[in-house]
Amino acid sequence: MIRNSTNTNNIMETEVALKDWILYYHKLCEVNSGEIFSGNEIITDFDDPVLSDPLLNLKPLPKNEVTVNKDNVIKDNDYSSNGCDFAKSKFHIKGLVGLLTTASVYIGLDNSTNPSYDISQACEFDLEDNTVQQGTGRSANMNPACKVAGFNKSSVRDTIFNIFKIPKKDEKISNDMEVNNTLSRDLDYKKDLFEFVRKYFGISEEETLIGHYTGWLLQEVLIQGNLFITNSSLVYLAHLPKLTDAVVLCGKLKLRSRLKGNPRYWCVLKHSTLALYNDPSDIYFPILSIDLNHVEEISLENSLKDENTMTFVLEASSKNYKFIAGSSHSAKTWVKCLKKQLFSIKNQSKDTIGIKFPISSIIDVECQSYMNQGQSIKVKCFDGNKNYALKEYTFLFFDKDGDSFYNIISNFIPRNMNPVEASLQNSNPTIHLNSKSHFNDKIKILSAVNIDDIICDTDSFEMTSSDILSDIDENIQPLSLKHVRDISNCKNYLKEDLKTSNKMTIQDCNKKVQTSEIQLITYSKHDSRMELNDDSKYYQGNIGNDNKGILSFKNICSIWNTSPIHNKDSDNFFMTSDPFVTSINDTTLAKIKDWFNLHDNEVLHALYYAYLIKGYPVYGKLYVTNRRLYFKSCIPGVNVKMVLPLEDIEGYNEILGTNYGNFGILLTVQNEKELQFGFNSCTNRSDFENVLQRCLDICKYAIKTPELVTSRVIESESEHSRLRFFEEKFSTEGIDIPFLVEDNPYFKTKIMPTKSYNFGFLTIGSRGDVQPYIALAKGLIQEGHSVTIITHREFKSFVECHGIDFKEIAGDPTKLMSLMVEHEAINVGMLMEASSKFRGWIHDLLVTTWEACKNLKLDILIESPSAMAGIHISEALQIPYFRAFTMPWTRTRAYPHAFIVPDQKRGGSFNYLTHVIFENVFWRGICSQVNKWRVQTLGLEKTNLAQLQQNKIPFLYNISPVIFPPAIDFDEWIKVTGYWFLDESESFEPSQELETFISKARKLGKKLVYIGFGSIVVNNAKEMTRAVIDSVLETDIFCILNKGWSERLGKEELRYEEEPEYPETIFLCDSIPHDWLFPKVDAAVHHGGSGTTGATLKAGTPVVIKPFFGDQFFFASRIEDIGAGIALKKLNVSSLSNAIKKVLTDKSIKRKAVSLKKRVAKENGVTTAINCIYSELEYARSLVVKKNHKSSNIEFIQHPNNVNDTTKTVIPLTSMV
């Protein structure tokens, strides 16, 4: 049965369409569909919103509308292209994954004669997490002892972090500091830091330093700081980090809405704003910007009732926002990052936070251990001026220094005790809470959201007393470390407590400061006085009320003729004689700041009324500040905002006005997009140009290295990722609280694992599949980890020459390639041979891969999904598992699967379905052998696509966001990191002939073009070679030719033909490192592989791509879409000559290639990938535990007719009617 509330007709139509598309996909593989699909049943789950939405929008395949051409792409019947194609591949599927897919379909033919086989076996769709499928059970002969044979689970090492303090090279630290003398540097920075503390707190010279430690103060966030013990005082000092424009966190979230349902947005958290976008590539037009200055509370929804909630709430002053994350792990990550950012926002005017109290006031100290290495130390002291009110401060230590700190403080306690204090201690016993209910009933906590709420200032340097705190926290109960996770659920107590607490005046603080014994100080470098600034009341009610700035239609005509407005208070930007200078009142400035979340250092210069042409004209106000351009619509019912950083503007031109704006201007921005504005007069436009140019000149001078566009929507800070990993490690121990690393002027904190991880990289295929892993391995080795690349024997020397360990596995894909070459057509003989050979091929691959991974005792496994075995091995070894690949492999509506690329865009439903079909067909071919291997070798139960949950696996795409922007429906664990480039140019020594050839081309002023298609197999290699030669002669260029296709000619009778003669303008070469060659040529013609395409983008080289198979069609279409080259459908003299001429002469293509070069050069794919591994590692580990837990609760049912079939739920088509 189907749990379904959808209209029956829609389901029937969808089912017919789905079956048509599946049959059509097999037509792509040139397999007789009648031999494979003979049943009338199908499996699906229409309750899955991600799956049902695109499927229910799918229409049946129109008859005679589309056909399959021999290039393995979908093609309209009316599409025509003149000329023959000499580069037509002899065998239509030659990519590695294409070969595996084709072979897997052939293997599936073995079951086609079974009457019980039906379409559901080739179309298993993933179910929701809470859905349990029934299926085949364990084999009767399964040996439980084989579960992890030869593997000791205790060998998996856990990781705790070291926090290193690296002294900063600064004159104020030590002028004569020796860089090589680490001990001297360490002593110098500690000495200078204590001198700063001495002056900061006014510590007398008579006090001597006993101990210096790094501790973390436990409040709503854990604040890293320095603890100093003198002979009379205990001091804590932390330098608060400043807000930056770096992306803290980004990803897909759903915003709960009553009117719109739960729309999905790309959310970016940075500085004081949480911005929501429709698409990661459309970053100038946020749909919603939430100013965190107005946010009062951040919490998980119903966290006590449901520990796995995926919803969290932002409570603002006038509106609440509910977000739905992709998983409970993701929701917790968002909450922690938001809380940390909110803490920084509320205290951004402060540089430091300090606590000082006499040693004599300490009456008790408690110590708890956690994770075998850390300590939580709670210090209790009293304030004699407030009836001996108790104070408690909890400090966390992530190293053994906690023992030393505890011993020193404990030694002071006996001397501090007297009868009065003893009686006080006995009357105020420590309460140890062991249950959540008791905890929630008794505990009241002090929120550390805003330090301004708990401190006050005086005129003197020693200005603040803990007496200020006593009215708030007098009844605070001791906080046990194990209850930290419930802090966020106790805010109601905090609010009640703050309402009933007495408010002290500045005068009261001044009277009591002289008798204080405890100090809590905040200090700003810019002002020695502290101020009680609370602007939240001023902005209350303004958030979300953008309609106040919307004008009625009757006012638009009059305002349209308004002259520009120049802000008089804009730092003398305009002359006083300027006729447009006007004073803008504070109320208007406050509204503008509220609308756009302006930074404190932004100054409004000018205001214009203009039209923004964004598909349709939008009338509104255009604001110019010293940092950005802002636009806000003024038409009722239209909500359009634009935020454009000035450094992104590359130029502007005057254009002919439209009907809506008689005088237009076109802005060209960094990502090659164009924004058009219309003004009512030439004067207004000229004034805007003058103001904009002045702002650009100032901005370009101040910002020498403009921020990368993609860095505004993708987190790239390594410390953020490491800190998230750090937080997740402690979250598993119950310390579910954000960590705040201090920004100390005397040293830089660096977080590194104390133990190295043992990584395994599993991949099969060609050199292009192995090379990116070498680059990533070298980056991880620099981090202190060990890496082993597990692949074919032929890459052993290539891997080991870079100092990386190598492990050999079977499964050489050249055996399948030779099988395809031997058979000129798909016939019965080929199917029989493929079936027998592929079974042995995949068996050897699975067995040798398991032996390699088991013997290596891996901690983390990263696999190219084409290797097939990694996901099962990680389950057997119970280790975190990542996937990494160079082509689209994740279900999305944004891109089709790389092996099912249509000639024209067919929409999100088609794109999504291509991934679903590919997954099912690929799994169909290998499921029987994989399940047999799981049972007999790994000791695991049989599985299917639903239970594998491949869409939940963390995925690293080693592709640049320039060519592959993250899709809006990508989950947080799917990362587009950038290319993993391996720099080989330094070690390459070109031949003298090659250097002479390049020099000759330059002296003659000829264009130099690279042409190479790799080792492809074509019908007539001789004709293709002649076409290339004739194209070179016709275009009058010099060509460096990598003629790999002539190594394996297509037809036997042509193999002994004479090689054509090459003119002097063609230089034949073998393999040359792309990073050395491509910067030296004017254009490149290649097959469109991921690595080759990335090399052309890195070099800024215009490109012509002639795809042959697999992902090459995808990258060809992407290059053409972004305007950096041409995708060639057919290769002959005419088409190739015209394409080469166009990329050499078209200035727009060259300009785009250069622009992309700058963007790719600023990316660091390896570093970003390592950061993603750190940030998603605990999530990957949780999947292993979750899968293991689920498998122990699943009841399997074995089908008697075919024990090798995968588990499935079969739904007859008739039941849908």
Curated annotation (Swiss-Prot):
InterPro entries: ATG26_PH_GRAM1 (IPR048066), ATG26_PH_GRAM2 (IPR048065), EryCIII-like_C (IPR010610), Glycosyltransferase_28 (IPR050426), GlycoTrans_28_N (IPR004276), GRAM (IPR004182), PH-like_dom_sf (IPR011993), PH_domain (IPR001849). GO terms for biological process: ascospore-type prospore membrane formation; carbohydrate metabolic process; lipid glycosylation; sterol biosynthetic process. Pfam families: EryCIII-like_C (PF06722), Glyco_transf_28 (PF03033), GRAM (PF02893), PH (PF00169). Residues 246-343 form the PH domain. It catalyses: a sterol + UDP-alpha-D-glucose = a sterol 3-beta-D-glucoside + UDP + H(+); ergosterol + UDP-alpha-D-glucose = ergosteryl 3-beta-D-glucoside + UDP + H(+). It is found in: Cytoplasm; Membrane. Keywords: Cytoplasm, Glycosyltransferase, Lipid biosynthesis, Lipid metabolism, Membrane, Repeat, Steroid biosynthesis, Steroid metabolism, Sterol biosynthesis, Sterol metabolism, Transferase. One of its GO terms (cellular component) is membrane. Residues 195-232, 590-656 form the GRAM domain. GO terms for molecular function: sterol 3-beta-glucosyltransferase activity. It is an enzyme of class 2 (transferase). UDP-alpha-D-glucose binds at S766, R767, D769, N1042, I1072, H1074, H1087, S1090, G1091, T1092, D1111, Q1112. The keyword Membrane applies. Its EC number is 2.4.1.-, 2.4.1.173. SUPFAM superfamilies: PH domain-like, UDP-Glycosyltransferase/glycogen phosphorylase. It is a peripheral membrane protein. Belongs to the glycosyltransferase 28 family. Sterol glycosyltransferase responsible for the glycosylation of ergosterol to form ergosterol-glucoside. PANTHER family: STEROL 3-BETA-GLUCOSYLTRANSFERASE. This is Sterol 3-beta-glucosyltransferase. It comes from Vanderwaltozyma polyspora (strain ATCC 22028 / DSM 70294 / BCRC 21397 / CBS 2163 / NBRC 10782 / NRRL Y-8283 / UCD 57-17) (Kluyveromyces polysporus).
